[in-house]
């Protein structure tokens, strides 16, 4: 959910209804209203409904439910003489721009709208950043988006003197927060007039030159980012909501210098979504018709036509939450009102049961305890230096370097546990079951989840045979007659380790820990370890059932 704060009276004045009616209609849109004080209300909105993050967007939606306006909102659009030249900006390659004339907006609300978009579709400015400028203060009709050196100077927003970009990164709050997103190789993305004056360095900060004030009615809007689709959608949402406030949208010519391509911005990205009448009836459990379905779609501010018996919904640019047929059905439910949908009776009763892998893991844990081992539990995250493989999932922004990777084996965690418990009474026999993430080139992500069990013994004197016997007992108790094939790796002593096979399928590894590995973990006593691949064991046992 996304929370916005609006002036209650300004919002009610746009739709001419009472507060209780407003709350009821917003509830239909899956939003909740909470009073803050006499003048202001707090509204919780679903994070996918970006079009509702301002009072004008809410007013547009409610006018549809009240049937004051039906179908897609129509706005005045005109061509302008403004041009945006997009150069090769390596860290944020995409940029679009638009003009909005004569929009009557609340400045505080516009800034809130901008920041809520930054936090949602913008992913805290990493994916998309928005610059909103006072058009009166833009001196050039040709604007360029390009890389500039960090020595470039301009007066940052609310500043009173020129600073270099390097100084902005060091001295301003925005520079400290967002500088690491886009700065690379000593250059920064920048929106620049044709005379070289900087208007903004996205996603960090605007220039004070084009600062908005209460008298601003004409806007130059730039949107930059790492995803062209997200940039286009964000610009469409902003200009649509400003146009809802009485503004006229001005197109900007966008030229891509790298390939000389040209387009007109904003793009107003529409899509056609076909909806089946029977599908709507099935999902909502109602009796309806194509005409009734179209009526509800129009109430949700989308266009709807029936062509050759097919319901065709035209999704406007501001409804980026509509991805497929089920999203349209959800909108129909909102138009009808969830309270007006009759709950259906249960036509069958089903009983849940444990997943087979859960039962298998439970059985393996019981066998481990029965074999004299104590169960421990480590974190799934681990320090990458403790891993033995170089193919693992790295955490991009870890809270601490102690947990900067996802484990691909349970063995490092057991060794770490042994290193911290060398003072305990010997022998130490411990085991763990849990999830790991292993490299797998056949999957979409290159990795897959795997379930494993690992066993360790540490004593003054311990050998391969000490771990092999209980492992063989556990596997035999599961109904598996396994073979052990000598295989060497960097964890175990050469000639004192093996892989565990069942019918030519590898089920685990076992061996005496290499002294170099013991030294690496600070362990002063010999240790033996085995790791079983529960996921593979489960597949084989399932085939035998």
Swiss-Prot record:
It catalyses: tRNA(Phe) + L-phenylalanine + ATP = L-phenylalanyl-tRNA(Phe) + AMP + diphosphate + H(+). This is Phenylalanine--tRNA ligase beta subunit. The keyword Metal-binding applies. PANTHER family: PHENYLALANINE--TRNA LIGASE BETA SUBUNIT, PHENYLALANYL-TRNA SYNTHETASE BETA CHAIN AND LEUCINE-RICH REPEAT-CONTAINING PROTEIN 47. Tetramer of two alpha and two beta subunits. Mg(2+) binds at residues 321, 327, 330-331. Residues 268-343 form the B5 domain. GO terms for molecular function: ATP binding; magnesium ion binding; phenylalanine-tRNA ligase activity; RNA binding. GO terms for biological process: phenylalanyl-tRNA aminoacylation. Pfam families: B3_4, B5, tRNA_synthFbeta.
């Amino acid at each position: 959910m996304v929370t916005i704060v609006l002036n209650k009276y300004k919002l009610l004045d746009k739709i001419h209804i009472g507060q209780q009616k407003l709350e009821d209609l917003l509830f239909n849109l899956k939003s909740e209203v909470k009073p803050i004080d006499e003048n202001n209300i707090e509204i919780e909105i679903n994070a996918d409904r970006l079009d509702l993050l301002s009072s004008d967007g809410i007013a547009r939606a409610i006018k549809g439910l009240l049937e004051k306006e039906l179908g897609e909102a129509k706005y005045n659009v005109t061509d302008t003489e403004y041009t945006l030249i997009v150069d090769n900006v390596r860290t944020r390659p995409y940029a679009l721009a638009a003009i909005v004339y004569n929009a009557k907006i609340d400045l505080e609300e516009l800034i809130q709208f901008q920041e809520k978009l930054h936090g949602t579709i913008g992913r805290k400015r990493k994916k998309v950043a928005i610059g909103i400028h006072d058009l009166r203060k833009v001196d050039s009709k040709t604007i360029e988006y390009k890389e500039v050196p960090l020595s470039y100077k301009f007066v940052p927003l609310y500043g009173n003197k020129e600073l270099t970009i390097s100084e902005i990164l060091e001295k301003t709050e925005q520079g400290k927060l967002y500088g690491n997103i886009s700065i690379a190789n000593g250059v920064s993305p920048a929106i620049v007039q044709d005379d070289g004056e900087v208007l903004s360095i996205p996603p960090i900060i605007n220039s004070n030159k084009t600062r908005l004030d209460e008298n601003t009615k004409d806007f130059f809007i730039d949107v930059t980012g790492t995803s062209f689709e997200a940039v286009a959608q964000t610009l469409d949402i902003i200009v649509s909501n400003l146009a809802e406030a009485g503004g006229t949208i001005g197109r900007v010519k966008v030229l891509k210098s790298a390939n000389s391509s040209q387009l007109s911005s904003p793009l107003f990205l529409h899509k056609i979504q076909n909806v089946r009448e029977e599908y709507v009836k099935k999902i909502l459990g109602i009796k309806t018709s194509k005409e009734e379905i179209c009526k509800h779609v129009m109430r949700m501010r989308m266009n709807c036509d029936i062509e050759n018996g097919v319901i065709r919904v035209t999704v406007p640019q501001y409804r980026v939450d509509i991805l497929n047929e089920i999203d349209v059905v959800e909108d129909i439910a909102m138009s009808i009102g969830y309270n007006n949908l009759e709950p259906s009776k249960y036509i069958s009763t089903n009983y849940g049961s444990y997943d087979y892998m859960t039962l298998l893991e439970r059985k393996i844990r019981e066998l481990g305890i029965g074999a004299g081992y104590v169960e421990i539990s480590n974190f799934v995250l681990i320090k990458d230096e403790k891993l033995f493989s170089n193919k693992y999932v790295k955490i991009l922004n870890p809270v601490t370097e102690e947990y900067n990777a996802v484990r691909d084996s349970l063995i490092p965690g057991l060794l770490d546990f042994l290193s911290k418990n060398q003072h305990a009474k010997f022998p130490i026999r411990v085991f763990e079951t849990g999830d790991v993430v292993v490299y797998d080139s056949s999957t979409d992500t290159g990795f897959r989840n795997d379930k494993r069990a690992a066993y360790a013994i540490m004593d003054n004197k311990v050998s391969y045979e000490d771990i092999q016997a209980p492992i063989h007992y556990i596997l035999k108790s599961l109904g598996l007659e396994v073979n052990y094939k000598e295989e060497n790796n960097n964890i175990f002593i050469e000639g004192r380790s093996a892989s565990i096979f069942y019918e030519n399928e590898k089920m685990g590894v076992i061996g005496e820990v290499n002294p170099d590995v013991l030294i690496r973990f600070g362990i002063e006593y010999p240790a033996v370890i085995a790791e079983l691949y529960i996921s593979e064991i489960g597949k084989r046992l399932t085939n035998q059932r």
